[in-house]
């Protein structure tokens, strides 16, 4: 009986810690300077949150090939509570720049901001695909 109790307790603790973060899923990025956008899959990467470009689209909305599909776009993000995430980096393929980044999740919208030194880029919004 004691073993059954311990096994049940262990299972319940494992389920509680394995719950998915609300940020996990697929997000449609804001259009870049050329009008292209992508789908980014946000997931757990060794206890932090990362995002990989899984599809790329032309300005027309038609799926397009891209050498960046499969590459990390977001990495090292940590939840800060109240829908806020920070401590990570974001790579902007159209500018080939990496920014210190912050995210704010509100429903199915994700506000993205990032800075290089004192220059900040703010206001891009991603929308949840699934």
Segment roles from a protein language model:
Residues 11-12:
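Repetitive helical segments and hydrophobic/amphipathic motifs
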Residues 15-20:
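Sec/Tat signal peptide C-region and signal peptidase I cleavage site
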Residues 23-24, 28-100, 127:
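Central antiparallel beta-sheet cores of small beta-barrel/beta-sandwich binding domains
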Residues 123-129:
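Short, low-complexity, Pro/Ser/Thr/Gly-rich segments in the mature regions of secreted, periplasmic
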Residues 94-95, 100-123:
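Short, exposed beta-strand-loop hairpins at the edges of beta-sheets
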